[in-house]
Design a protein with these regions (language model features):
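Bacterial N-terminal signal peptides
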Residues: 1-8
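A generic "folded-domain core" signal
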Residues: 13-163
């Protein structure tokens, strides 16, 4: 089981066909969360270099709260401890943030809402987001996300959480 898997109660598609907003139960905490997610446009290989994977970028909040946290489900082993992720929008420079890794060792997440806000501010107004991570004892992997419609989808997520 992937830690933190969202079991949807309702799904609302955002303005862009790339972003999906849903409200459901988090399988690891059993709490209701609202989530904005997108699968990567590019693939990476699993830790055995046999399968192509599309990591999923998610922004989450709990209804009734304003804090948004970011996470990426890489669907492959990343690390058993905190790791640095690089985020680059369009032709800019990488911004490196130290993120935590969940118990499955496959999901990285921001340690705080303030850290997630850095990523949100970086992504707003951009067209493409590149994310780079170096799995433990492996070569770096990079994935790309389409930021078209992100601003509107983020507004929908915030609306879902403010209720």
């Amino acid at each position: 089981m992937i830690a933190g898997l969202l079991l949807p109660l309702t799904t609302v598609f955002a303005d862009s066909d790339k972003w999906e907003v849903s409200v459901g139960e988090d399988s690891s905490s059993y709490k209701t969360v609202a989530s904005l997610q997108q699968e990567s446009l590019t693939t990476i290989k699993d830790e055995y270099a046999k399968q192509d994977l599309n990591p999923q970028l998610q922004f989450r909040c709990t209804p009734g709260e304003t804090a948004i946290t970011a996470r990426i489900d890489w669907q492959r082993f990343i690390s058993s401890f905190s790791t640095e992720l690089g985020f680059k929008v369009d032709g800019g420079k990488f911004t490196w943030l130290k993120w935590k890794v969940d118990q499955s060792n496959k999901v990285t997440f921001s340690p705080s809402a303030a850290d997630s806000q850095k990523l949100i501010e970086l992504a707003l107004g951009g067209e493409k987001l590149l994310v780079e991570v170096t799995p433990y004892s492996a070569s770096p992997v990079t994935v790309e996300y389409d930021l078209e419609g992100f601003s509107g989808a983020l507004a929908e997520l915030k609306d879902s959480c403010s209720q």
